[in-house]
């Protein structure tokens, strides 16, 4: 899980320009990290590229926090 978390954290920091310390498993992309809907779509696309997977629109809608993203990635690998 640490590897996925580190990789997800790097993508979030790069994409949203937030401090790495703010990227916790409980952090919500929109409420805590200031992402808008377009940011979330772009994050999902970057996660797909980084982890070489496809995330369905239905699954993407369920990914609201950093922990959701990490858990989803770990469940698919």
Curated annotation (Swiss-Prot):
Locations listed in the record: Cytoplasm
Family (UniProt): Belongs to the acyl carrier protein (ACP) family.
Upper classification of the organism: Bacteria, Bacillati, Bacillota, Bacilli, Bacillales
Protein name: Acyl carrier protein
Gene: acpP
Post-translational modification: 4'-phosphopantetheine is transferred from CoA to a specific serine of apo-ACP by AcpS. This modification is essential for activity because fatty acids are bound in thioester linkage to the sulfhydryl of the prosthetic group.
One Pfam short name: PP-binding
Keyword vocabulary terms for this entry: Cytoplasm, Fatty acid biosynthesis, Fatty acid metabolism, Lipid biosynthesis, Lipid metabolism, Phosphopantetheine, Phosphoprotein
Function text: Carrier of the growing fatty acid chain in fatty acid biosynthesis.
Any Gene Ontology CC annotation: membrane
UniProt key word Lipid metabolism: yes
Biological process terms in GO annotation: lipid A biosynthetic process
């Amino acid at each position: 899980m640490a590897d996925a978390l580190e990789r997800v954290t790097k993508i979030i920091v790069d994409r949203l320009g937030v401090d790495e310390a703010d990227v916790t498993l409980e952090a919500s992309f929109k409420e805590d990290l200031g992402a808008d809907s377009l940011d979330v779509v772009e994050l999902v696309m970057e996660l797909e590229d980084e982890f070489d997977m496809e995330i369905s629109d239905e699954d993407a809608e369920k990914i609201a926090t950093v922990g959701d993203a990490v858990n989803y990635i770990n469940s698919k690998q």
